[in-house]
Every structure is written in C-alpha cells, then in structure tokens.
C-alpha cells in the first residue's frame, strides 16, 4: 500500500494538521499518510481531525518524543 511521509517535527498547533490536510488532498482515496510530529497537542488534534473529515487514523504511536500518525484517506469525497 502506498504511504507518503510528512515530517512536521518542530511545528506547533495548528500547523501539523494544516500540513497534513494539504498533503491528504494530493493523495488518492485509500492511500496513507504517515505524519511525524513533536507537538504533544498533535495527539488529540489528529484524532479530532480524522473524526471530523472522515479520514481513518489507523495507527498512532510515540517514540523518544516523536509522535507518528498513519492516516488513510477516505474513500469518497465528503
């Protein structure tokens, strides 16, 4: 499965979500975006973003202060 990497480490809210939204617009339905972020607020922000937009948050983890989120683009336009 295709996965695009978006590194937004060092950026604070709302920039990680805004950059992810822009990157998702360039993807085809079903493709995945992996976002790397260091802003602790990103955990709640990406969960809310996916619920609001219909994209699927398929994975979320944290290692050494870096949060990783895998988002699958929704299949149909909202």
Predicted feature residues:
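Right-handed parallel beta-helix/beta-solenoid
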Residues: 1-7
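Amphipathic, hydrophobic secondary-structure cores in small proteins
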Residues: 8-60
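Core SAM-dependent methyltransferase catalytic element
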Residues: 68-78
